[in-house]
C-alpha cells in the first residue's frame, strides 16, 4: 500500500502491510505449502527509526517465526516498472535513481520489477530448504 491510500495512518498502513503478509504466511503453513516467498525491502530492520523499514523488518521476523524452512525473503531496492496507480514521489525516485544508476552500488540500485519476479520464480522451483534472504545485489546478479 502507500501512505496516500491510508491518509498517513500508520495503523492502517501496518494493518495492510503486516497483517496481510502474516495471514497469508499462516494460511500457507496451515495448508502445508512447501515454500513461502515474499518481497520485503532493502534496508529493512526491526530496530530502524524509519517506520517503513522498521515495519518491513518486523514482518520478516514474524514470517521467519511462522515459516522457518523453505522461506525466501526478497529485499529489492526501489522497484522500476509500470503501475496501475500513480505514485508521484516514487516516480520521481525512479527517474532520479535510473539517471544516476551507474554511480550507485548494486545494494541500493533501483531494480526492474520483472527481474525480481523472474528471480522469485527461479527460487520457487529450486530444491533449496532453509531461510534465505536475497538482497538487492543478489537479485541483480542472480542470472549472471
Regions found by a protein language model. Give the residues of each.
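A short small-residue
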Residues: 1-5, 38-41, 98
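Short amphipathic alpha-helical segments at helix-loop
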Residues: 5-9, 43-44, 101-104
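Alpha-helix N-cap/loop-to-helix boundary motif
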Residues: 12-20, 43-55
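SDR active-site strand-loop-helix element
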Residues: 36-42, 74-76
Amino acid at each position: 500500500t502507500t501512505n496516500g491510500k491510508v491518509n498517513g495512518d500508520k495503523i492502517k498502513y501496518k494493518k495492510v502491510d503486516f497483517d496481510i503478509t502474516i495471514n497469508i504466511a499462516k494460511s500457507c503453513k496451515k495448508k502445508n505449502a512447501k515454500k513461502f516467498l515474499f518481497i520485503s525491502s532493502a534496508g529493512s530492520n526491526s530496530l530502524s527509526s524509519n517506520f517503513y523499514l522498521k515495519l518491513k523488518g518486523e514482518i520478516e521476523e514474524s514470517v521467519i517465526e511462522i515459516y522457518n524452512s523453505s522461506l525466501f525473503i526478497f529485499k529489492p531496492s526501489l522497484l522500476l516498472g509500470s503501475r496501475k496507480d500513480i505514485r508521484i514521489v516514487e516516480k520521481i525516485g525512479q527517474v532520479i535513481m535510473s539517471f544516476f544508476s551507474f554511480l550507485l552500488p548494486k545494494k541500493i540500485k533501483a531494480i526492474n520489477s520483472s527481474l525480481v519476479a523472474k528471480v522469485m520464480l527461479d527460487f520457487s522451483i529450486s530444491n533449496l530448504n532453509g531461510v534465505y534472504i536475497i538482497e538487492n545485489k543478489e537479485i541483480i546478479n542472480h542470472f549472471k
